[in-house]
Each structure stands twice: as C-alpha cells, then as structure tokens.
Amino acid sequence: VLFRSEGLQDAASAFISYNIAYRRDSLDAQTVARIAGIFNNNQQFKDAVDVTEVYRLSDTTNIDVNRQNAKAYCMLKEYGTAVKRYESLKELGDRSFLTLYYLGVSHYGDNWFYGAYDNLKEAYQKNPMDVNVLYYLAKASARTSWKKEGVEYMEEAFRIAVPSDSMMVRLYDGLVECYDYAGDTKKEVEALEKLYIYTKKNSILYKIACLYDWKEDEKNAIRYYRKYMATVPEDQRYALDEDGNPVEDRITLYQQAWKRIKKIKEEGFFRGDIPTKSFPVEKKDTLALRHAK
C-alpha cells in the first residue's frame, strides 16, 4: 500500500516521481502498477483503468498491472470485466488472497453466487479472520445451497469484528438477510431488533410486524404495528397534496399498518377470539378511519 504513515505529502511526492517515470516510459510495468495503485487508493478508479489499459495494449500478462486493472473494474462495479481480469490472473498462477477475495466479490456483484462462494471460501481459508471475507462469504452462501453456512459465517464475523456502529449495522443487516434465506424467522426478528437499536429506522419495526403477521402471530404483529405507528411523525403519516389534503390513491405504511391491525381484529372477532369490547378505535384519528376502509 502506497498511502502509509508517511502522510499525504509523501504520497504526493511518490506520485510525482512515478508520474515523471511514467511519462518517460509508459510501458514500464512496475511504474504503471504503482501509479495505478495510487489511483485506486485515492478512489480514482477510471484513471487506474486508463493507465493500465494503455499498458495492456502491448502486454496482457503482467500480474501486478492486471491486479490493479481488475481491482479498478471491481470498484467501478463493472463486475463482468473484473471477473474476466481476475480469472485471467488465476490462469497466470495468481491465487493470492486479494485476487481470490476480489474475484469472489466480483462474482457476487455479477449475481453468480456459486462462483462467489468458491473463491471467497478459498480466500477465507487463507485468512479466516478477515471480516470482509466472512461478510461476503456469508451473503454468497445464503444465496446458494449452503444457507446454514451463511448464518455461521456471519455469526463468526460478529465474533471477531471491531464493534464500531457502522460495522455492526452492516453485519446485522447481513445477518437478517442470511436468516431470511435460511427461513429462520425467529432469529431474523432477533437480528432486526438489534438492527433497530443501531439505526432507529422505524421501517424495521414495520418489517418485524409483517414477519409476525406472515407467521400468523397476531398478538406480536399488532404489537409491532403499533410500535411502528408510534414512531411515525404526524406529518409523515398520510400522503398529502401541497394544500395539506389527503391524496386518495396513495396509502402510506402508517395507514397500511392501521388497516392490518383493523383486519386482524376483525378476523379474530368473527372467529370468536376477540370480544367486541377489546376492539379499539384509533384516538379520533379520522384520517386513518377515512383511509382504512
């Protein structure tokens, strides 16, 4: 890595030196690879592509140049091209950790989850403590036949991750996804509750309510629909036009939650599960009543 503790001034000096060398000889593989590495580290991915593609017009076999070229395509989310570049690197004998990792990520981005699983699994075997590898390996596994492994990998990522809020949000979001694919609704709800603690996004409460609703757990469905409704600001509860009047053909999640509570209670009443006196009306919420027909 070229950006180290020397600081930005040293990194800039290094770039100037390599740039001078590049102008003298744009076909020197070491110089091209280092300039492309600086571009990639500085998130100038298109520039990294440009300098490496010029070099590749005369030589497509240099491993260092191709690594930077492939990484730039991956970071640009041009996953199809990135996969081709990384597969070529493997054919050249490169089975380094980063090549396997980025090839797995590129396959994942290109929606070929079995290819992602194979390469990320190999990267994991080289470095089982890398949280990013575990994260993508878990997500790839969840979309293949190895759904149980997906849960295990994501749980392992939790055990070794640095507990920063941003990382925990990412991991809990991934854990929710893995439990969803594995069909473990109970664990999915638990992960969603943890995710809500970190994000405070009320849509998570609505999702939990929907999961309970789908499982026909009426008590918890109503409880979470109400939790969700309590967190929605008054000015976001209904779709209003510029004059503040309700828009008839648009229903918000708040209104949908109210409708589901009403429907669940109606169904319970007709089954004899819910007595008439427990059939509450929202507190003079005339707009909700109007749109819950």
Model-derived segments and their meaning:
Residues I20-A21, V54-Y55, S88-L89, E122-A123, ...:
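Canonical positions in the second alpha-helix
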